[in-house]
């Protein structure tokens, strides 16, 4: 009995040693925004679909992300390939032959693609992965998703002119495909080939989508990245949102540095009336995965906590890290938009 008691005591001491002292001194900061206009981009790791067992579950997760992004007028979604940053291989989902990164990016793009351009946007070999996506309700907050609205405006894709006619510049065209085998010839414009444009079908000219749709959300752009240096160019501030880490414990010593050296953002402060947008990038995911991704990246920052402008602390009812990434999105964006208003 004495041996058993001693063994339990040692285990208790070892467990206590792994934990940092309570009452960590957490830094807080007011994030200065030198603009009156704030735009948001989000970076979603491929680990967001690690627990999905089939295509239907993957599609639903992508739809949740897309719907939130449209509701909050997110400008861009970056899909971060973290297949090299996990200690364990993901479990296979049926007979999928494309990477999680490409699958997630394809689904996210599908949900903001106008119905009349679906046939030209996606390759036939990838349409297999869209069979579940077509069953979800369209995101009707986007004006071009509603066939009955703004009838004389159409989303189109510029296509090359017949090269046999010997046009002077093959990189430019005046032809725009608007779906259902309909092609509009622009009256007095030449535009680059394979460009997504908004067309006034009555005047037969390309117009600004902001003017055409009267300031309504226009959806987001999707791109893929495999390292943090591919992610971070072009943003004014970069913020980490701790999410998707159901074993996160701030008292563990391995999280000591991030808890004490990466400040929590208390609020935003607009110090300028400039109309030049401040672009804020929110990066979601586990700290451990991001650290391994950081080591693969060619960045000037000496450590990961220097890479970020700060981190977000959710309300007390939401445990740090212990929330699915797709559920953390609306909370994070609500907090930022409230601060910026």
From Swiss-Prot:
Q: Which molecular-function annotations from GO does this UniProt entry contain? A: methyltransferase activity
Example of a GO biological process term = methylation
Instruction: State if Nucleus is listed as a keyword.
Output: yes
Protein EC = 2.1.1.-
Which key words are in the record? Methyltransferase, Nucleus, Transferase
Please name the top-level EC class of this enzyme.
Answer: transferase
Q: Where in the cell is it found?
A: Nucleus, Nucleolus
Q: Which domain of life is it from?
A: Eukaryota
Q: Which residues cross the membrane?
A: none
Q: Which cysteines are joined by disulfide bonds?
A: none
Gene3D superfamilies hit by this protein: 3.40.1280.10
Q: Which GO terms describe its cellular component?
A: nucleolus
Task: State the CDD domains in the record.
Answer: HsC9orf114-like
InterPro entries named among the record's database cross-references:
Alpha/beta_knot_MTases (IPR029028), Put_MeTrfase-C9orf114-like (IPR003750), tRNA_m1G_MTases_N (IPR029026)
Give the family, as the similarity comment puts it.
Answer: Belongs to the class IV-like SAM-binding methyltransferase superfamily.
Task: Supply any other comment.
Answer: Present with 2820 molecules/cell in log phase SD medium.
List the PANTHER family hit by this protein, alphabetically. Answer: CLASS IV SAM-BINDING METHYLTRANSFERASE-RELATED (PTHR12150), METHYLTRANSFERASE C9ORF114-RELATED (PTHR12150:SF13)
Name used for this protein in its record: Putative methyltransferase YGR283C
